[in-house]
Amino acid sequence: MGIVDAVGWAGATAAVLFMLVFTVDGWTRTGYRPDYHPVSALALGGRGWLQKANFIVCGGGIAIGSLALIEVSILLTLGIGVFGMALIASGVFTMDPMRSYPPGTPAGNPASFSRRHELHDHAGMVVFATVPIAAGIATFTPQLSDPLRVYSAVIAAVVTVGFLAFGQAWENDSARTGLWQRLTILVGWSWLAVLLAISA
């Protein structure tokens, strides 16, 4: 296995591991509702270190994994690299406690947000924006196979819709906010894992 293969598989593994960790962690957290609370809320509380590490380690793995695509498309490499770095930033700058999590936190949003929370929001916007952008780039990358390009086109559309639905659910404090986010992550990160694995 060469260096390109190794970094590609590292990135693919990181994308899958990220989903696995937040899924298991969310199922086993007291007071945490996966269908309602966002993934980022797992970085709060006594076990918050686990999701912080998940953001940072998996973000780093994906950023490194993007290098497997450098001979395929520099734009695609940059897009996925930025995604990975934004994921790292999401772990460094955590969201504020809100909406009944961690347990004992009042329902709803706080009267004001910390600078750390604002930086987390900015990083999250980059994370969710770069997936459909990268998928769109992949759609028009002739070095990729036709099936992968079609798959990428579908992902670009689906993740865009999912991101908008999640954003609307968040603004409305919907009981299904976490569900929309998780579905969007599952679709987008799975595509990313497939892309990096194929490129390895």
How does the language model describe each region?
Residues 2-38, 42-200:
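Hydrophobic, aromatic-enriched alpha-helical segments typical of multi-pass transmembrane helices
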